[in-house]
């Protein structure tokens, strides 16, 4: 249990922005008829130092990993959920939150506190919503946040080689993407600079020479295959349509699925052509990356014809997908999840086991999507054990 002094300490944080004011890139959507412009709040962060870091001065000066420690702390970056179109990085601030049923304990905040007590620093980040940037804009934001903290590691008192990532729902999806499509991922080894830039976003980065690699990831009830989520629901005994859907997938990727000729589209993002939508649908799924399958199609843009395929050595890519390490991943999912069925995590777990990537999975009986039971003390402790066991330096 945390005493009052410790509670006050671990709940102190400082906020800032990891991208400059006025940031805009080719993925930002005002040119496509966006609902709201990109504001700097899209790139906000909260930073919570490891417990004890503030006892010997500011966090920049102490670099403490915990009480009595002088070592830089490992950092966990938390990516919030919200169907890629809402949510906030402020969700780990308060221990008590209001719900329609009344006040309840925020177990995600207790998770954050437990991490700090065990010598971890925690950062929570925002990213551009799907009505502010088309995919992979949100992934580029997440990777830029990793670069930001790594580049300023000394100022934050963190170890630049020990950065992990976690998140729930949409944040779980992006956590998996960051872990599986890292800068040294096997799929890049075939010599496809377009694919590398697609996932990395270095061209718009303030820190293009800094790695976006994460050492390990813990996605909670994350989406691993956007193509099958709707078929997974009825197979699991749930309704095809979920109240939280509201076109989350097509808003993120450009059109509905399967990708037909543009004249047949039911839903679409203005200004996104068929080739771009095809590319996004092929490259957005962590399950493919967990299996070592990277979509190497190269699109010219502006045409509804069949995309060309870049020449590459299939055998070489398969070998590299097996031999080159991707970040270890621990998956947490509720068995009663009617929004993102737990099979979405099971398939990733099976794929990683097949490739002999360190992995773990916790399936929570009776837990729905976003259920607080996914953050029980026992699961948080198991998460800490996994993080500490797999935290190999990435730079």
Walk through the language-model features, giving the residues of each.
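Alpha/beta-hydrolase superfamily serine-hydrolase fold, recognizing
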Residues: 1-395
